[in-house]
Structure formats: structure tokens, C-alpha cells
């Protein structure tokens, strides 16, 4: 299951996951302080400082997600890079903090194909290449996911994931490394 993560809801999330019996759980940050990290949230009235503060808060929540150890997998770690108003605001410091938290806790980041195909406006994956390299520098391995919300999304996204893995030489962890 993929589940939203908010630091204030960690106790409720833990209770839910303990009783739900899922084989594994993907945690993702979709909202920060009541605002969407998705491209349909407007930041038009926000200046650079407010946008940077939102990005900082987003990555604080991502680090909190990893440190909570509630989830096996960290989903689309750099979701905010999809947002035109936030794209390019992820810093090396953000990437290092997230990678260090994943390395320390064993939370496995997902190479996610949700930015590709009909739903995505890019031919890119999550995380972006600088994030992939930072994870690799920290010895963090990956799982892969299509983020398919419709069966028709699988084929093209699987092809894109295969090309990416072949190009980068990344050997993802098998599902058995996540389950159980």
C-alpha cells in the first residue's frame, strides 16, 4: 500500500499499519502544512523565500518519514520537482539529509515512473539523477515502482524503468528484500 505521511499523524499511521497486515508499505509525502506538493497547488502569490520554505518543510517531512521507520519504501522522494514553481529548489543539502536518513534507517527509496507516460509531463523518473547519485554515494539501494494508477500505465512505464536501470547499471532490490 502507498500511504500519505504527515509527521503529526505518525502515531495514527503506526496503529493503522500494525493492524492492516500489508506485506509492505510505501510512505510518501504529498502535502505539507495543508498544501499539495503536486503541480496543481498554486504558488503564484508566494515569493522565493516562501517557496524555499515550503521545499525545506517538504524535505523535513521526508526525513521524518524515513526516521519514523514506519514504512519499508520511500515513494517518489522528489515529488516537488514536478511542480513548475518548485522545480530546481531541491539542494544538495536536502538530498544528503534524505539519503543519510534512509541509510541509517534502512528505508528503501523507490525509483518511481510516475512522471512518465500519460500522467507525467516529463520523460524522467523519481528521483532525479542528482538524488540517485546521492543515494548511491550513501550506499542506499532502490526498489522500482510504476506508480501506475491504471493498468494501462504499466507497459510504457516498465519499459522506461528497464531503460533507466540498464543505462545507470542499478540493480534494484528484489521484492523479497522488502517483504517480511
In which residue ranges do the predicted regions lie?
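Extended substrate/RNA-proximal surfaces in nucleic-acid metabolism proteins
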Residues: 1-105, 166
Amino acid at each position: 500500500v502507498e500511504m500519505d505521511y504527515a509527521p503529526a499523524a505518525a502515531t495514527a499511521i503506526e496503529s493503522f499499519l500494525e493492524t492492516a497486515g500489508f506485506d509492505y508499505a510505501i510512505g510518501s509525502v504529498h502535502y505539507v502544512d495543508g498544501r499539495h506538493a503536486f503541480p496543481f497547488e498554486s504558488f503564484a502569490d508566494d515569493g522565493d523565500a516562501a517557496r524555499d520554505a515550503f521545499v525545506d518543510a517538504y524535505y523535513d517531512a521526508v526525513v521524518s518519514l524515513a526516521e519514523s521507520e514506519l514504512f519499508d519504501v520511500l515513494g517518489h522522494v522528489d515529488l516537488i520537482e514536478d511542480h513548475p514553481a518548485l522545480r530546481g529548489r531541491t539542494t544538495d543539502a536536502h538530498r544528503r539529509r534524505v539519503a543519510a536518513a534512509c541509510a541509517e534507517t534502512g528505508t528503501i527509496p523507490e525509483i518511481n515512473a510516475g512522471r512518465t507516460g500519460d500522467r507525467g509531463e516529463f520523460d524522467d523518473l523519481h528521483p532525479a539523477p542528482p538524488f540517485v547519485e546521492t543515494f548511491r554515494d550513501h550506499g542506499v539501494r532502490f526498489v522500482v515502482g510504476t506508480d501506475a494508477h491504471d493498468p494501462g500505465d504499466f507497459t510504457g512505464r516498465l519499459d522506461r524503468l528497464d531503460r533507466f536501470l540498464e543505462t545507470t547499471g542499478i540493480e534494484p532490490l528484489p521484492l523479497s528484500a522488502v517483504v517480511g
